């Protein structure tokens, strides 16, 4: 009886989390991923995005696992996370002054990949928007966990740095293996790596968050990464300060799909 009660409580928690992820997903980010610049999307395109978010929400099975580790910079300049060592000048700057770090893995689950594959086979225009929406949704999920951690550490008088993922700046993608091994991500979160270091499920993230005793002045402190903090100026997805507030623009309108069509049953 107690087991059944706990099962129902978990189902309710998951439904609440899924609603939080959908509700906090940054719609501007979705249009930015789709190549929009400078102009507001049309109503039918906004409706298509909302439709994709709603449908994706029904396939979410979010999982998150992370651990805190002591952190130091060794004499040779390498970063010692206790469970592994790494080299990255941009990450070293991000973690300056930190003596602990929080490493984590997060995923939207295998159901999202299944939905994306299905639409790739039957309706590519919608699949493209689905991909962008799912990418924004995993960021939204990480932001939710980021805020939860910030509150927890804040009660101890500690502050978080912007999260930093392998492949970001000069932090090599090779360190995905170190994250996966140290955190036992296959067991703890259902995340595996391919030989080419891609994560499965595809809408998954690994990252390190610095923990310090002083507030961080870097952009993105409140909830994750910021384009302003990244040195990759030529990134096609880089957020630009252009146009008026609340506007996004487009350079590839057709890629978002056309029309407010009836959703296929799949």
Placement of each model-derived feature along the sequence:
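Active-site helix-to-loop segments that bind/position phosphate- or nucleotide-bearing substrates
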Residues: 2-130, 251-254, 263-266
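Short terminal or interdomain "cap/linker" segment that borders an active site or interface and mediates
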Residues: 108, 156-243, 247-266
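Residue-level preference for alpha-helix termini and adjacent loops
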Residues: 94, 107, 129-132, 136-137, ...
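Flexible, glycine/charged-enriched surface loops at secondary-structure junctions
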Residues: 62-71, 149-164
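Compact, glycine/acidic-enriched structural inserts
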Residues: 125-147
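Structural signal for hydrophobic packing residues in well-ordered secondary-structure cores
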Residues: 53-60, 149, 153, 231-234
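Short, well-ordered, mixed-charge alpha-helical segments that flank or form enzyme active sites
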Residues: 112-114, 137, 168-172
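Conserved active-site and cofactor/substrate-binding residues in soluble primary-metabolism enzymes
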Residues: 44-47, 51, 136, 140, ...
